[in-house]
Design a protein with these regions (language model features):
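Active-site segments of SGNH/GDSL-like serine hydrolases
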Residues: 25-31, 50-87
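Catalytic His-Asp segment of secreted/periplasmic serine-dependent ester chemistry enzymes
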Residues: 68-146
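Hydrophobic, well-ordered secondary-structure scaffolds
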Residues: 45, 49-53, 135
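Sec-exported extracytoplasmic/periplasmic mature domains
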Residues: 12, 16, 27, 50-57, ...
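Loop/turn elements at helix/coil->beta-strand transitions in domains of secreted/extracellular proteins
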Residues: 18-21, 56-60, 99-102
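Conserved SGNH/GDSL esterase-like catalytic core that processes O-acyl groups on lipids
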Residues: 1-47, 83-86
Length: 146
């Protein structure tokens, strides 16, 4: 995991290969571990997208929603976070629409009763094998379009 600024720092090594597509899922660490506002976080995300578009204009960009967390796994760390993630995902969807990018709603496929089910996570946030299977099924059809 990383924050958006860390993802930006890694872009040069990724974009030098001029990838056909990039699948971005970013912002969970920023939301969970910093006091950053949605507005500031989205500005960082937009910067990430601008760099990709500028440095690798033929790269197709897919924006993935954030995944839910399992709040009951660690109430202190994750309590109330799914509401924030839902709000952020809505803002990501809007941003993708404004920019003409594909938004992939992984949240809906991954969640049960509004959170990440225990069997799909190893620690409340990171996926287990069962979680990765759900994720792969959600993005497979987009991968084959590339």
């Amino acid at each position: 995991g990383d924050c958006i600024s860390g993802m930006i720092n890694r872009l040069p090594s990724i974009l030098q290969g001029k990838p056909k597509a990039v699948f971005i899922m970013g912002g969970i660490n920023d939301l969970l571990f910093s006091k950053i506002s949605y507005e500031k976080l989205l500005k960082q995300y937009e910067r990430l997208l601008d760099i990709i578009a500028s440095e690798s204009p033929h790269t197709k960009i897919y924006i993935q929603s954030l995944l839910p967390v399992n709040e009951s796994y660690n109430e202190k760390m994750f309590g109330g976070q799914n509401e924030r993630i839902i709000r952020y995902n809505a803002l990501l969807r809007e941003m993708a629409g404004r920019r003409g990018l594909t938004f992939i709603d992984i949240w809906s496929d991954m969640q049960q009763n509004g959170e990440l089910p225990a069997e799909r996570t190893v620690d409340g946030i990171h996926l287990s094998g069962a979680g990765y299977i759900v994720w792969i099924k959600a993005i497979r059809r987009y991968i084959y379009r590339v």
